[in-house]
Amino acid sequence: MLILTRRVGETLMIGDEVSVTVLGVKGNQVRIGVDAPKDIAVHREEIYQRIQHERTVQSQMQHLEQGSFAPSFDDEDYFNR
């Protein structure tokens, strides 16, 4: 992890297209501005985690609807034990 120190008004660059600027500091909160192309998603971590969770649930539901989680054993063999 790269650790940087920036003052209000200073900017750091991520690649050629993303800039992060410190807008203000108030108590233990830091306001930052992110300037990135529209095709690059920028989320707070808790929002990103919720999106990932929702995608996982949605994917699992699609697999269930398609029968992907059906038992892999032969029904006749299973019930004739």
UniProtKB/Swiss-Prot annotation:
Q: Where is this region: Disordered?
A: 60-81
Predominant subcellular localization, coarse grouping: cytoplasm
- A Gene Ontology biological process term: positive regulation of translational initiation
Organism superkingdom:
Bacteria
Q: Where in the cell is it found?
A: Cytoplasm
Job description of the protein: A key translational regulator that binds mRNA to regulate translation initiation and/or mRNA stability. Mediates global changes in gene expression, shifting from rapid growth to stress survival by linking envelope stress, the stringent response and the catabolite repression systems. Usually binds in the 5'-UTR; binding at or near the Shine-Dalgarno sequence prevents ribosome-binding, repressing translation, binding elsewhere in the 5'-UTR can activate translation and/or stabilize the mRNA. Its function is antagonized by small RNA(s).
Protein family according to the UniProt entry: Belongs to the CsrA/RsmA family.
Tell me the protein's name: Translational regulator CsrA
Species, as recorded: Psychrobacter cryohalolentis (strain ATCC BAA-1226 / DSM 17306 / VKM B-2378 / K5)
Gene (UniProt)? csrA
